[in-house]
A protein has these predicted regions:
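Bacterial N-terminal signal peptides
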Residues: 7-16
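A domain-start/cap signature at the N-terminus of enzymes
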Residues: 21-87, 252-257, 300-305
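Active-site machinery of serine-nucleophile hydrolases
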Residues: 85-88, 92-155
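Alpha-helical scaffolding within the catalytic cores
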Residues: 103-112, 185-187, 206-216, 255-258
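Alpha/beta-hydrolase fold nucleophile elbow
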Residues: 163-177
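Short glycine-enriched nucleophile-adjacent loop
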Residues: 180-191
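A conserved short beta-strand
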Residues: 193-204
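C-terminal catalytic histidine-bearing segment of alpha/beta-hydrolase fold enzymes
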Residues: 226-241, 245-305
């Protein structure tokens, strides 16, 4: 069991530096709960593999602008109930995005609130505004274990909860687009795959199918894969379903708009084909919130006896 270590918004986001833009997010979400925007030693970046930046299609993305952001956003909703174990939903953004952009564009905080779930949202910075899926330190062995330890330590040091003795509960790993790669690495060698209760791929199954299947076979967590016709994930999604069918592993394949709450709650492997474009799959129909509602996370308000 892991415990803590001892030791106008659109204009602001468009013009501010990464640290300044992130800092201005905190008061913007105060009505919903407590947002902390901080920096982690264990955050994906900086990383030696991107010390000289990254070249994509002959264009160089320098390290200073794209691979030096160690920002991690942590949001605790009003009314969070302390139980001694904290459930986390950790979302990894895709290409050409940032922490501030992800919170704004996909309304993750608003969707968490709408779900009514007793969970903490965490959004670490990946490659900032770059065409890159590299997960930095979170791709290293035990990288996720170190990240969660620093996360718990931060919550403890900031006095977020009244009780000091708390540990990691269930963890949902969510990723849009290029966010798939860091999730696959976490499941494969992050050190705490057993804590990953669910994996959500928002038009993100581009590769690493073996790692996702290995996690599912070993830990029997819920895998939700929503895919589009033109986002580049259809072939891999259909190939994964074919593998499951060949080995007689049950799964649900349904149109995203027709999936019922009961279907989402009772199936372990779920493939949702959608008519939405790539960048709309997280927020347009509030799927992030719907996935949360059908998760095993506790509600903010306990059910009436």
């Amino acid at each position: 069991m892991l415990r803590p270590m001892t030791a106008p918004l659109a204009i602001l986001l468009a013009t501010a530096t990464p640290a300044l833009a992130a800092g201005n997010l905190e008061p913007a979400y105060a009505a919903h709960g407590r947002l902390m925007v901080t920096q982690f030693v264990s955050a994906p970046f900086p990383h030696p593999a991107r010390a000289t930046g990254h070249k994509y299609k002959a264009k160089l993305y320098p390290a200073k602008e794209h691979y030096s952001d160690s920002t991690v956003a942590i949001f605790i909703p009003h009314g969070f109930r302390e139980t001694g174990r904290v459930d986390f939903v950790i979302h990894f953004h895709g290409w050409h995005n940032s922490v501030a952009g992800t919170l704004r564009d996909y309304q993750l905080i608003e969707q968490l609130i709408a779900s009514g779930k007793n969970a903490v949202l965490v959004v670490p910075a990946g490659p900032r505004d770059a065409p890159d899926s590299f997960g930095g330190k979170l791709e290293e062995r035990d990288g996720f274990k170190h990240f969660l330890a620093e996360l718990l330590a931060t919550l403890q040091q900031r006095g977020v909860f009244q009780r000091k003795d708390f540990s990691v509960g269930r963890v949902i790993l969510s990723g849009h687009s290029g966010g798939y790669r860091v999730i696959a690495a976490i499941l494969d060698r992050g050190g705490l795959a057993k804590n990953a209760d669910e994996v959500w791929l928002f038009d993100a199954l581009y590769a690493e199918t073996d790692k996702f299947l290995a996690w599912s076979d070993r830990h029997h967590g819920r895998l939700l894969n929503i895919y589009t016709d033109h986002g580049g994930t259809k072939d891999d999604s259909e190939a994964m379903m074919a593998r499951l069918k060949k080995r007689a592993t049950p799964f649900l394949a349904v149109e995203e708009a027709k999936a019922t709450t009961d279907e989402l709650k009772t199936n372990q492997l779920i493939f949702l084909h959608t008519d939405l474009p790539h960048n709309d799959v997280v927020e347009k129909r509030q799927e992030f919130s719907r996935f949360l509602k059908t998760s095993r996370f506790d509600d903010l308000k306990p059910a009436a006896p």
